[in-house]
Structure formats: C-alpha cells, structure tokens
Amino acid sequence: MRLRHFAILTTTCLTLWAPTGCSAPPSDSAPAEAQAEIPAPTAGDHEVLPSERLAERLLTANDLGPGYAARPAATTASPEASVEGCPQLEHLGNAADNPYAMFPNQGKRVFTGPGGTQLTEELYSAPPKDLSAGVGRIMTTMGACPSYRLVTPTTVAEVRTQTVPVPRLGDEQWGQVLTVTAGGRRTIVQQTVIRAGAVLLVVSGSPAEVTVHAQTALAKATAR
C-alpha cells in the first residue's frame, strides 16, 4: 500500500525523523497523565466557521510561552510512505490522502518548542453531526491495528498504537498515542482530538505538551 501522509499522526512521525524535525524524547518516555477535568466552552450555536476565521483562532507562539516559535508552512510534500501490517489504513488514503480533508474549512499551525520538540494544531469546522461521524470513523480506523510498519525511502519504523483517555473537554474527545521505533530511537507522539459544537481541534506532539496546551487551544478555538 502506497500512501502519502495517510494520517495526521503518521505525518508527525515522519517529520520527527527528518533532520529538521524534533528530537526524540528519552527511551523511558510515556504518555502523560490526563490533566484534571475542567469545563471548556462549546460552540452553542453550532455555527460552521470558514477557514479564515479558523486561522484567527489558532494558537500563536505567544500563547504557548517562552521557547516556542511557529514554523514556516511546508513548501514540499511529505515523503511517501508504505504501511505494512494494517490494511485498514488504506481507507485513510482517500480525500487528498488526508483523512480530515473531508472537512474543507480548516486551519493549521506547526510550532517548534523547547529542546526541538514539535507541536501541531489543526482546526476544522463542519456541522456537528458530520464532525462526529467523520472523526469517529477516522479514529476507529487508525486504532484498528495495534502495530504496523511504516516504510519510507530512508526509514523503516515499527509503530505501535494505543487509545488513551483524554480530559472531558468540549462535546466529544478522542486520544491516541503512537510509539515509533526506528534506528535505535523511540519517539512517542500523542494526538488529542476534541469536538466542541461545529469546531474540531486536533493537537499532536509529545504527550506532555499536548496535555498542557490542548485546553488552551480549545478555549481559543471556541471563543466567541
């Protein structure tokens, strides 16, 4: 199966192995514990937001604090990857090879953080019913295989997936952790997905950073 950045998490993992990517955490890293449950605002009127308004609601480096900087938008395509051992992921090769592309209203920003870490925030907007059904299918498919191999022209990585609990923010929440092992290094990447009304937030990065910044991102994304 040949896919190009077939899933947001896999794109993040590929970036982590690039020379300009983030340094891997220590080998004994583990998913951070979920923070205390704190209510967050939801989009009560379920208004679908255009991409321009979503872009205004993305986090900035100032929102994240010292040591963070926004990365320039990518000018080249992600490396093509083959997935071995998980035929279910083939379904995520549709919609421009991005499973979230079914939601045309979207915004994205990538940050580098202290120590060379990477944090990615994405916002999407669609009717709540469409967001709920679409993301449910995506996360079910991405979690269908507990392990598989990710092969690029320069890297062969063993990937293990784990569904994890996330704070009860917004209307619906999903969480997944990927443990990627290649070249003697192990990298752990978490993706937290939160739907609040007609807005969908996707935050990917190290478990600790995702746990710390997801609530701030949701508050800004759903602010009136």
Each model region followed by its residue ranges:
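A small/polar (G/S/T-enriched), proline-flanked helix-loop surface module common
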Residues: 68-180
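A short, solvent-exposed beta-edge/loop patch
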Residues: 157-220
